[in-house]
Curated annotation (Swiss-Prot):
Tissue expression notes: Expressed by the venom gland.
InterPro entries on file: Toxin_34 (IPR013605)
GO MF annotation, one: toxin activity
Species: Ctenus ornatus (Brazilian spider)
GO CC terms: extracellular region
Protein name: U4-ctenitoxin-Co1b
Family assignment from sequence similarity: Belongs to the neurotoxin 04 (omega-agtx) family. 03 (type II/III omega-agtx) subfamily.
Main location: secreted
Length: 24
């Protein structure tokens, strides 16, 4: 799973869908 923390996301890997969706 991914978790957004302000200006970045963390999660299982760098290609987490939440990070893609948010432009990270």
């Amino acid at each position: 799973s991914c978790i957004k923390h302000g200006d970045f996301c963390d999660g299982d890997n760098d290609d987490c869908q939440c990070c893609r969706d948010n432009g990270f």
